């Protein structure tokens, strides 16, 4: 797989991860929706949380915590991690609180 194709694959995986997390949260928050790409702030709207979703290859928790803290949200913030090798079963994802 070429570098450009790999980059596109990672972006698609990230967008797909946001979507499956939003769908999962709809059980409790029916208006939960993925924001898509290129938007500042929470990756999922329609919940009382500030959520950063990451589909990751490298484990960089300090960078992600810094990113979410810089938003200065008055909501409870957390980071949802989909590690390499994980499918779309959101219950198996990791959550970090900054």
Pin down the residues of each PLM region.
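Catalytic phosphate/metal-binding cores of nucleic-acid and nucleotide-processing enzymes, i.e., regions
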Residues: 1-96
């Amino acid at each position: 797989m070429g570098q450009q194709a790999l980059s596109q694959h990672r972006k698609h995986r990230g967008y797909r991860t946001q979507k499956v997390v939003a769908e999962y949260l709809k059980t409790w928050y029916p208006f939960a929706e993925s924001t898509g790409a290129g938007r500042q702030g929470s990756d999922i709207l329609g919940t009382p949380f500030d959520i950063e979703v990451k589909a990751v290859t490298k484990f960089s928790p300090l960078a992600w915590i810094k990113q979410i803290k810089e938003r200065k949200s008055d909501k409870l913030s957390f980071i949802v991690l989909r590690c390499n090798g994980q499918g779309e079963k959101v219950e198996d994802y990791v959550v970090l609180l900054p």
